[in-house]
Amino acid sequence: MTGSVDRPDQNRGERLMKSPGLDLVRRTLDEARAAARARGQDAGRGRVASVASGRVAGRRRSWSGPGPDIRDPQPLGKAARELAKKRGWSVRVAEGMVLGQWSAVVGHQIAEHARPTALNDGVLSVIAESTAWATQLRIMQAQLLAKIAAAVGNDVVRSLKITGPAAPSWRKGPRHIAGRGPRDTYG
């Protein structure tokens, strides 16, 4: 036991390096690299000679300078508008703005007494809190359309459908049987 002792880990590594399968892999890799170099492509270096950074030697980083630049951080709202514009969502965003920011679009006083319910095919449905406000909004319809167009753009809302509050129901309970028809109940 005084001679040299072979470690099993060391023998395994040496056997692996001499195996015919590994030689085949190395040869195939060398052939692929040579073919890539012949085509003028980057042959790759594997793990051995990896570059510490992605910079090309001899090129310095250029700073954007004191003026605005495309690489400067952009406000989130601007980036969202550009994304909506690129993807063709501008009309949908404008429609959502009419419904979501109604008070800012038409003004505080009108927003207190009327609320939008739907926007379908350029027709904005608005429910007023009273018949008097519904009549007033119908009279002001041209001015309302101008305010909306100024806030969100033309052709988003082409017309308004203004309704008053729903009429009272005389039904009692969850079930209903058809009555005898309309009657003069106030007379």
Swiss-Prot record:
Region annotation (Disordered) ranges: 1-23, 35-75, 168-187
Pfam families, sorted: DciA
InterPro entries in the record: DciA-like, UPF0232_actinobac
Start-end of Basic and acidic residues biased regions: 1-17, 35-45
PANTHER family reported in the protein's UniProt record: UPF0232 PROTEIN SCO3875
Family: Belongs to the UPF0232 family.
Cited NCBIfam families: PRK03195.1
Protein name in UniProt: UPF0232 protein Mb0004
